[in-house]
């Protein structure tokens, strides 16, 4: 019975591993990246502009947000 349980557990693990949806980001794409070249990302208008910039530039159409970094700096980051 323990051998059967081990085989079933291994089979279930394989099913889970192969069913995971992998998202890749490429360096030249806006998606999944932070963009310092976007400029300031401090006000509500900047957040709206960042979101629109990512919506227009990413194929996934998920938008973006102003991500906080060390020192309190915020930069535009597009969702994966």
Curated annotation (Swiss-Prot):
Pfam families: Defensin_like. The keyword Disulfide bond applies. Belongs to the DEFL family. This is Putative defensin-like protein 23. It comes from Arabidopsis thaliana (Mouse-ear cress). One of its GO terms (biological process) is killing of cells of another organism. The keyword Repeat does not apply. Keywords: Antimicrobial, Disulfide bond, Fungicide, Plant defense, Secreted, Signal. It is found in: Secreted. InterPro entries: Defensin-like_20-28. Its main location: secreted.
